[in-house]
Amino acid sequence: MADLAKIVEDLSNLTVLEAAELSKLLEEKWGVSAAAPVAVAAVAGAAAPVAEEKTEFDVILVEGGAQKINVIKEVRALTGLGLKEAKDLVEGAPKPIKEGASKDEAEKIKSQLEAAGAKVELK
């Protein structure tokens, strides 16, 4: 065991350049590559379980923007609200416009509202 402790001590005292040279010498002597364990680690990391993709989104009106009239019109068209309700919703932002929407529907609503001048986010 004393020999192993001496080897560990000697290795600990190596400079980075000396350690790199030792690595190359050992690769040649044993016919292995130091890069192989890195590749295995990367593959193992990629095999980690993937988080489920979110399927339902809430479309949140963050801000009505400078063109509130256009945003109010778009909110009315998307939600079926009356003029006063749509105006109150836009002026009371941040407020949800649609909850539990599919990804495609949420993206469509977001793009329509942004085209009208609103700031929108999906949650």
Curated annotation (Swiss-Prot):
Sorted UniProt keywords: Ribonucleoprotein, Ribosomal protein
An annotated Gene Ontology molecular function: structural constituent of ribosome
Pfam families named in the record: Ribosomal_L12, Ribosomal_L12_N
Gene Ontology CC terms, in alphabetical order: cytosolic large ribosomal subunit
SUPFAM superfamilies: ClpS-like, Ribosomal protein L7/12, oligomerisation (N-terminal) domain
Alphabetical GO biological process terms: translation
Tree of life domain: Bacteria
InterPro entries (alphabetical): Ribosomal_bL12, Ribosomal_bL12_C, Ribosomal_bL12_C/ClpS-like, Ribosomal_bL12_oligo, Ribosomal_bL12_oligo_N_sf
Classification via NCBIfam families: L12
Family to which the UniProt record says this protein belongs: Belongs to the bacterial ribosomal protein bL12 family.
Protein function: Forms part of the ribosomal stalk which helps the ribosome interact with GTP-bound translation factors. Is thus essential for accurate translation.
Subunit organization: Homodimer. Part of the ribosomal stalk of the 50S ribosomal subunit. Forms a multimeric L10(L12)X complex, where L10 forms an elongated spine to which 2 to 4 L12 dimers bind in a sequential fashion. Binds GTP-bound translation factors.
Name under which the protein is recorded: Large ribosomal subunit protein bL12
Organism: Bartonella henselae (strain ATCC 49882 / DSM 28221 / CCUG 30454 / Houston 1) (Rochalimaea henselae)
